[in-house]
Every structure is written in C-alpha cells, then in structure tokens.
C-alpha cells in the first residue's frame, strides 16, 4: 500500500505540475520537453489527445511517447530517461541561432537527474546564454542517492 499510495500521489503532483506548465506557458510556441514517456501523458491530454486515454476504441491513436508526428506540442520522440535537459539545450540554441523568441522548458524527475546525459545537459545549460528553464520534479521517492537534488535545493 505504501508504495502504490506514494506513486499515486506522485502522479497527481505530475498532473498538477503539467497543468501549471500549460497555464503559464504558451505551447507549442513555448517548447516543453518532458524527460520520460509517462511524464507526457497529462501533456497529451491537455493538447487535444485526451480521447485516446478515455475511450478504448481510440487507444491506438496515440503512442506511449511524445511524438512530433502526433502533435506540434511534441518536439521529440522521447522514451529514455535523463534526456530532457540536453534536448532542451538544443532547442534553445537553435532558437537563439535563428533569432527567434519563446521559452524552452525541460522537465526532469529527481531520479533522472543522476543520469550522465542529464549532467552533461546541466553543464551545457550553465554556459547557454539564452532562455532555458529547468523544472525538477522532485517526488522524493527516488531510490538513488539524493545528493544532486539536495544540492539543487540550495
């Protein structure tokens, strides 16, 4: 019960955070990059694909991942962990090189933050001169050492 209850609470917070992101930012002009596939489900529901989650005969209308072929709100096919920051850095750099505007937001979970690609993305983000926002979804149930997330709270 403890873990399933915690998982349910975590997913509720993920849904609330995704709603807040869509309220504050103007997707798809502002580009939101989620880290792993399950983080994209509320995003998909908010961007016109909710029927695929509500009606069994429409389940096949969406993939289990973000997918640019499904929607302009998806910018990559994402399924692997620790990639959002690096991908968002690429979008931000491309936006800046083209003289465009708009926000780029990377959403990453605390467990994914310990991955090598996430750390490389943080290193590059520190040198990036453009507008890049990193949102850490700290659900506090990550089984990994918490030093990285604890350091980011300072």
Where are these regions (language model features)?
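Single conserved hydrophobic/aromatic residue that forms the stacking wall/gate
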Residues: 1-7, 11
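Cofactor-binding active-site loop characterized by glycine-rich and histidine/acidic residues
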Residues: 12-128
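Short beta-alpha junction loops
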Residues: 111, 138-141
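Asparagine-centered polar/low-complexity signal
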Residues: 123-124, 137-139
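Short hydrophobic alpha-helical runs that function as membrane-insertion/retention elements
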Residues: 132-135
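Long, well-ordered, tryptophan-enriched scaffold segments
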Residues: 141-154
């Amino acid at each position: 019960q403890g873990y399933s209850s915690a998982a349910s609470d975590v997913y509720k917070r993920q849904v609330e955070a995704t709603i807040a992101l869509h309220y504050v930012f103007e997707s798809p002009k502002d580009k939101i990059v989620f880290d792993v596939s399950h983080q994209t489900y509320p995003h998909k529901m908010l961007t016109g694909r909710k029927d695929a989650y509500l009606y069994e005969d429409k389940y096949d209308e969406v993939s289990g991942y973000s997918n640019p072929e499904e929607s302009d709100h998806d910018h990559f096919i994402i399924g692997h962990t620790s990639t959002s920051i690096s991908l968002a850095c690429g979008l931000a750099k491309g936006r800046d090189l083209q003289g465009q505007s708009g926000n780029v937001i990377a959403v990453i979970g605390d467990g994914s933050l310990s991955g090598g690609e996430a750390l490389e993305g943080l290193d590059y983000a520190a040198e990036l001169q453009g507008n890049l926002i990193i949102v850490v979804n700290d659900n506090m149930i990550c089984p990994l050492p918490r030093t990285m997330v604890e350091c980011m709270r300072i």
